[in-house]
C-alpha cells in the first residue's frame, strides 16, 4: 500500500481505496500467494479496514480501530508495523466478540451516512440491506461497483421529501409513541461481524445504551425503518383528491375511514391478498381483512417455488399494525400530538424490497446483541423490528408559524405537517433468514471467484450445506 505522504492527493487516494482495489493490489496478491490456503472472510475484510484506517488516521487522528487490531497480532514483524500476514492471522483467530468490537469502531467512524466519506467507500463489496433482494434475483453485479451516493436531490421530489421528513418521524416515534425511551437516531455503517459481506444502516433504534463512542444493543432493542410516503402528500384544498378522505379520517379515526384514505390514490400502498394467494411486488404493505377488498383482482395461488413467501406470510398474517392519527396544528395552537390510535390488520409484503431490508437489519443487530454482551442469559437475543409509514400534508396559511411535536419539540419550518403514522411489526422466520442469506452469500462468492484472482472464502456457516465453500 502506498505511503500516504508520497501521494499528491491523499484524500483522493483514500476515497478510491476500495475493497476491490485492495484485493487487486500487488501487496495483497503477494501476501495471498504465500498463504498455505485461500484467505477467508471476514478476516480479509478486517485486514482491508486496517489498511484503510491506517490511511485515515494520518489526518483524522482516529487510531482506535488500528490499535485494537494491533492488540490481536501476536508478533510485530518490523519497525514499520506488522505485516499483512501477521495482521491476517491475528484477525483470522479473533473471536466473534472481538470482531464485533472492530465493527463497532467502524460504525462510530461512519455516522452521518451519505455525508460521511468513509461510509461511501465501505459499500464496495458489501451486500447492503437495499441490495439484498436484487442480489438474490440478479446476482451481486453492482456490489463491487456501487453507484456513487447522490446528495443533489430535487427539493420537490420523493427522495428529498423523505430525507427532509425523516427526523420528524423519529421525533414522533421517540417522543409521542415510545415515551422518551432511550434511542439512537444517528447510525454509521454496520458490517456483519461474523461474515464481513453484509452491511446495514439503521434509521432509528430504541432501547439502546451507550458505552463511550459505541452503541450497545440489547435484547430489548427495537428497530424502526422509516418510510415517508410522498405519493400521499396532499394540500388542504377541495381540489386535492386526497383531502376529503383525510378529512373523514381526521373527524372519525377508524378502520373504515383509513381504508378510504389509503385508497384515495390510483396505486394504494396497501394490497388485499386472501389466504393462499400470491401478493404482487408493487408495494410493501398487505392485508387479509375482507373490508379492504374493494375491487375484484385475480391473484395467483401460492405454489411450488413460493415456500419462503408462504412461510413469511404465515408468520405475519396475524400482525396488528397501529395507526396513529395526529392532531391538526391549525386547530390546536400549533401543537401536534396523537389524536387517536386505530389497530388495523396490515402486515409487510415478503416479496417487496423493504422486507429484505429489515430482514438484514434484524440479522446484523442480532449479531451485535449476541456478541457484545447486550443479551441476558436465557433470553432471545433478537431485536424487534417495525416498519414505519408516515403521511404528511403541505402547510397551509391557517397553520401557525411555529408548530411543535408535543408541547415543546419544535417542528422545522421547512418540513411538511405529519398527519398520520402507521407502525407495522415485522416477523422474520429463522428458515427464511437462513435461506435468504445462504443464497446471497453463494451469489457473492461466485461473483468474487469470477472477478478476483485472490477471492476470499465466504464463511461456510452462511450456507445450508457446508460443501458450498472449499
UniProtKB/Swiss-Prot annotation:
<keyword id="KW-0255">Endonuclease</keyword>
<protein>
    <recommendedName>
        <fullName>Shutoff alkaline exonuclease</fullName>
        <ecNumber>3.1.-.-</ecNumber>
    </recommendedName>
</protein>
<comment type="similarity">
    <text>Belongs to the herpesviridae alkaline nuclease family.</text>
</comment>
<feature type="site" description="Required for function">
    <location>
        <position position="227"/>
    </location>
</feature>
<keyword id="KW-1132">Decay of host mRNAs by virus</keyword>
<keyword id="KW-0694">RNA-binding</keyword>
<comment type="subunit">
    <text>Forms a complex with the DNA polymerase, the DNA polymerase processivity factor, and the major DNA binding protein.</text>
</comment>
<dbReference type="GO" id="GO:0030430">
    <property type="term" value="C:host cell cytoplasm"/>
</dbReference>
<keyword id="KW-0378">Hydrolase</keyword>
<dbReference type="GO" id="GO:0039595">
    <property type="term" value="P:symbiont-mediated degradation of host mRNA"/>
</dbReference>
<dbReference type="GO" id="GO:0039657">
    <property type="term" value="P:symbiont-mediated suppression of host gene expression"/>
</dbReference>
<keyword id="KW-1192">Host mRNA suppression by virus</keyword>
<feature type="site" description="Required for function">
    <location>
        <position position="203"/>
    </location>
</feature>
<dbReference type="InterPro" id="IPR034720">
    <property type="entry name" value="Viral_alk_exo"/>
</dbReference>
<dbReference type="InterPro" id="IPR011335">
    <property type="entry name" value="Restrct_endonuc-II-like"/>
</dbReference>
<dbReference type="GO" id="GO:0004519">
    <property type="term" value="F:endonuclease activity"/>
</dbReference>
<dbReference type="GO" id="GO:0004527">
    <property type="term" value="F:exonuclease activity"/>
</dbReference>
<comment type="function">
    <text>Plays a role in processing non linear or branched viral DNA intermediates in order to promote the production of mature packaged unit-length linear progeny viral DNA molecules. Exhibits endonuclease and exonuclease activities and accepts both double-stranded and single-stranded DNA as substrate. Exonuclease digestion of DNA is in the 5'-&gt; 3' direction and the products are 5'-monophosphate nucleosides. Additionally, forms a recombinase with the major DNA-binding protein, which displays strand exchange activity.</text>
</comment>
<dbReference type="InterPro" id="IPR001616">
    <property type="entry name" value="Herpes_alk_exo"/>
</dbReference>
<keyword id="KW-1035">Host cytoplasm</keyword>
<keyword id="KW-1190">Host gene expression shutoff by virus</keyword>
<keyword id="KW-0945">Host-virus interaction</keyword>
<dbReference type="GO" id="GO:0003723">
    <property type="term" value="F:RNA binding"/>
</dbReference>
<keyword id="KW-0244">Early protein</keyword>
<keyword id="KW-0540">Nuclease</keyword>
<keyword id="KW-0269">Exonuclease</keyword>
<keyword id="KW-1048">Host nucleus</keyword>
<dbReference type="GO" id="GO:0042025">
    <property type="term" value="C:host cell nucleus"/>
</dbReference>
<dbReference type="Pfam" id="PF01771">
    <property type="entry name" value="Viral_alk_exo"/>
</dbReference>
<feature type="site" description="Required for function">
    <location>
        <position position="225"/>
    </location>
</feature>
<feature type="site" description="Required for function">
    <location>
        <position position="166"/>
    </location>
</feature>
<dbReference type="GO" id="GO:0003677">
    <property type="term" value="F:DNA binding"/>
</dbReference>
<keyword id="KW-1262">Eukaryotic host gene expression shutoff by virus</keyword>
Amino acid at each position: 500500500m502506498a505511503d500516504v505522504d508520497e501521494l499528491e492527493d491523499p484524500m483522493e487516494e483514500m476515497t478510491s481505496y476500495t475493497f476491490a482495489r485492495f484485493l487487486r493490489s500487488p501487496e495483497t496478491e503477494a501476501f495471498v500467494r504465500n498463504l498455505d490456503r485461500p484467505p477467508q472472510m471476514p478476516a480479509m475484510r478486517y485486514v482491508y479496514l486496517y489498511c484503510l484506517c491506517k490511511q485515515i488516521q494520518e489526518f483524522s487522528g482516529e487510531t482506535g480501530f488500528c490499535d485494537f487490531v494491533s492488540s490481536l497480532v501476536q508478533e510485530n514483524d518490523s519497525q514499520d508495523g506488522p505485516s499483512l500476514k501477521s495482521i491476517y492471522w491475528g484477525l483470522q483467530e479473533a473471536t466473534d466478540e472481538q470482531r464485533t468490537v472492530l465493527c463497532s469502531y467502524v460504525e462510530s467512524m461512519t455516522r452521518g451516512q451519505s455525508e460521511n466519506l468513509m461510509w461511501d467507500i465501505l459499500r464496495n463489496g458489501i451486500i447492503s440491506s437495499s441490495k439484498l433482494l436484487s442480489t438474490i434475483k440478479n446476482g451481486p453485479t453492482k456490489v463491487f461497483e456501487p453507484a456513487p451516493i447522490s446528495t443533489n436531490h430535487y427539493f420537490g421530489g420523493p427522495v428529498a421529501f423523505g430525507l427532509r421528513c425523516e427526523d420528524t418521524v423519529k421525533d414522533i416515534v421517540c417522543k409521542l409513541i415510545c415515551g422518551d425511551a432511550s434511542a439512537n437516531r444517528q447510525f454509521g455503517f454496520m458490517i456483519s461481524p461474523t461474515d464481513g459481506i453484509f452491511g446495514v444502516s439503521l434509521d432509528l433504534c430504541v432501547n439502546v445504551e451507550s458505552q463511550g463512542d459505541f452503541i450497545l444493543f440489547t435484547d430489548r432493542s427495537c428497530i424502526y425503518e422509516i418510510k415517508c410516503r410522498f405519493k400521499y402528500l396532499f394540500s388542504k384544498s377541495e381540489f386535492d383528491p386526497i383531502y376529503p378522505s383525510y378529512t373523514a379520517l381526521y373527524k372519525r379515526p377508524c378502520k373504515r375511514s383509513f381504508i378510504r384514505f389509503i385508497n384515495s390514490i390510483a396505486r394504494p400502498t396497501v394490497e388485499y391478498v386472501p389466504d393462499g394467494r400470491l401478493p404482487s411486488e408493487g408495494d410493501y404493505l398487505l392485508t387479509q381483512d375482507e373490508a379492504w377488498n374493494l375491487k375484484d383482482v385475480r391473484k395467483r395461488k401460492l405454489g411450488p417455488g413460493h415456500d419462503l413467501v408462504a412461510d413469511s406470510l404465515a408468520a405475519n398474517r396475524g400482525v396488528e399494525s397501529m395507526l396513529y392519527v395526529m392532531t391538526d396544528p391549525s386547530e390546536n395552537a400549533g401543537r401536534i400530538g396523537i389524536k387517536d390510535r386505530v389497530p388495523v390488520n396490515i402486515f409487510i409484503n415478503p416479496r417487496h424490497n423493504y422486507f429484505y431490508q429489515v430482514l438484514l437489519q434484524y440479522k446484523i443487530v442480532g449479531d451485535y446483541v449476541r456478541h457484545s454482551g447486550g443479551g441476558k442469559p436465557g433470553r432471545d437475543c433478537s431485536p424487534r423490528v417495525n416498519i414505519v409509514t408516515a403521511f404528511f400534508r403541505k402547510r397551509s396559511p391557517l397553520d401557525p408559524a411555529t408548530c411543535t411535536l408535543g408541547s415543546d419539540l419544535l417542528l422545522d419550518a421547512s418540513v411538511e405537517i405529519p398527519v398520520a403514522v402507521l407502525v407495522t411489526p415485522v416477523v422474520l422466520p429463522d428458515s427464511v433468514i437462513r435461506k435468504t442469506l445462504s443464497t446471497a452469500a453463494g451469489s457473492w462468492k461466485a461473483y468474487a471467484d469470477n472477478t478476483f484472482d485472490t477471492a476470499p472464502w465466504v464463511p461456510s456457516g452462511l450456507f445450508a450445506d457446508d460443501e458450498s465453500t472449499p
